[in-house]
Amino acid sequence: VITRGALLERTGLPRPYATSRPLRIAALELAPPGPQEMLVRVLAAGLCHSDLSVIDGSRPRPMPMVLGHEAAGTVEHVGADVGGFAPGDLVVFAFVPSCGACLPCAEGRPALCEPGAA
């Protein structure tokens, strides 16, 4: 699956970002969705303050990184183990990286991931 995203390759570029242009729209290849995943065609996405804190380096993250973690779109594919959704459904979502190892992740609450939320 080929898509496009706002790609950040390095942090700490000077402001104003309209001049230093830390982001570029890049073609990205995604692995096919697994049995517990969905593929969503993003129709609208936003960049917010948490994304700016990644750009300026105050919230360290592995690079390169695609920014924007709040979006709305249309479900294109639903994995075999996903219930309650069908292709064509309109959805909104917030993505927060999760480590899979901290207490909230172990309790099935990855949106509260301690390293991901830091």
What label would you give each PLM region?
Residues V1-A6:
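Short structural boundary motif marking the start of a folded domain
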Residues A111-A118:
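Short cysteine/histidine-rich zinc-coordinating motifs and their immediately flanking basic loops
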Residues T19-E29:
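Short glycine/threonine/proline-enriched tight-turn/helix- or strand-capping micro-motif at secondary-structure
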Residues L30-A45, I55-A106, A111:
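Glycine-rich beta-strand-centered segment in the early N-terminal region that forms part
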Residues C48:
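Conserved Rossmann-like nucleotide-cofactor binding loop
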Residues G12-S20, A118:
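Acidic Ser/Thr/Pro-rich low-complexity disordered segments
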Residues L8-P14, A45:
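Short polar catalytic/cofactor-binding loops
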